[in-house]
Amino acid sequence: MNLNTLNDNYIYKYLSSTSEVRGIVHISHGKAEHIGRYKWLISMLNNNGYHVISIDHRGHGNRINNKRSIGIFSNSFGWKKVVKDLKTIIDNTKKEYPTLKQYIFGHSMGSWIALSLFKERLDISGMILSGS
C-alpha cells in the first residue's frame, strides 16, 4: 500500500501485483466507516488484477481530528467537499493511469457520493452501488 496526501486527503493505493492490471476501483465507504473495513474486498480485487485507490472521507477513519468531528464532513458545504474529494482522486488517477478503466464501488453513504459524481457526468467505466 502507498499513502499519498492531497491537501488533507489521505489517499490509499493498494496496487495489484498481477502481471496484467485490468482496471482501477475507487471505494467510497459508508457513514461511520473507513477504508480499513474493506480489506477483504481490496484483497479480492488486487488478486483479480485491479488496483484500488481510496480515501477515508472527511470526518472518518484517519481523517478524524477530534471526537467532535466524527462523521462531520465540514462546517460548511461538507457534501460538496466530500464529492469533490472523490472526483479529484479519480481525475488524478486518470492522469496517472490513462489506459486503465476506472470504476467506483460505493456503499451506503458512499453510494450517494458516487451518484452525486454520476450526476456530473463523470467519465468512468462502471459503478457498483451497495446498500443504497
Regions found by a protein language model. Name each.
Residues 17-24, 50:
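Proline/glycine-enriched tight loop/beta-turn segments at coil->beta junctions
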Residues 97-108:
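Alpha/beta-hydrolase fold nucleophile elbow
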